[in-house]
Amino acid sequence: MRSNCEEIVIRMKNLFRFKVTKDTGIAVIAGLVMIALSLLMIPFGGDSLRDTVISFILRDVLMIFGLGVVFVSLYVEKKSKEVIAELGFSRRKWALSLILNLAFAAGLLAVFLKDGKPADVISLKNLYGASYILVAGIFEMTFIYGFLRMSFEKAFGIIPSILLTSVFYSLHHAGFQPEFLHLFLVGLMYCGVFYITKNMLIIFPFFWGVGALWDVLVSSEAGDEIKNPVSFGIALVILFASVIWVLFRKWRRSSNVVKNIDSNLGNAQER
């Protein structure tokens, strides 16, 4: 049996460590690319067709779909299926995570509603915005709270991981919601809560959803830009493209397995 001192040492190593690897560098570069894409959006914040198209390419295509879906899925394929659990997507304590998710969401909503419900909070335009926010949330779960957090934890430990992830989370809003201190604190909250069960179901979709929807649609002027049918359409396109990409990669892996089996059988027959 381990002594109390050994247990303390192990826990401290989980909280703080220094084990920088090639994967750490990949995470930092990917995170900086995310921030750069957001910063590039600043000159294109107008309502013109050109600004809309460029913002769509920068945020929706390259950031949300490119980094959140394509990059993360290819990274997982290159490593192993076990990485999926390390990202926070597993059956580990899923029931407890879901219960806590609902409880935290209810508590947060109660705090928001203590001064009364805002007028027109339930409306078609807010539905458009909510659809876009929830789809964009998939990117935050896979890339920021998943990939970046996991990479920083492996390199520096849990505490630095929470801090670094929150910094990147805050800075990735630079081009469309520059409320850095507020969003840093939001990142601390969600990232810290994640470590209660290490399952993404403890924050997404309800707890994160309540905070994100209220923060963007009610408290921030940034929400006005997505309260329209175009944003709803973009959300559907991203969601559809993500499903197609996942199915395509799954088919590709299955096809490669069959080819390898056929190749091995052919080599065996030649012998």
Identify the meaning behind each predicted range.
Residues 24-29, 97-99, 127-130, 159-164, ...:
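Hydrophobic alpha-helical transmembrane segments
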Residues 20-77, 230-236:
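Alpha-helical transmembrane segments in multi-pass membrane proteins
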Residues 1-19:
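Short, Lys/Arg-rich, polar N-terminal cytosolic tail immediately upstream
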Residues 40, 180-236:
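Functionally important transmembrane alpha-helices
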Residues 32-40, 105-114, 166-175, 208-219:
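Aromatic-anchored segments of alpha-helical transmembrane domains
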Residues 44-53, 83-86, 113-124, 218-227:
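Membrane-interface helix termini and inter-helical loops of multi-pass transporters
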Residues 66-70, 119-175, 185:
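Function-critical hydrophobic alpha-helical transmembrane segments in multi-pass membrane proteins
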Residues 76-83, 245-261:
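Membrane-interface capping segments at transmembrane-helix boundaries
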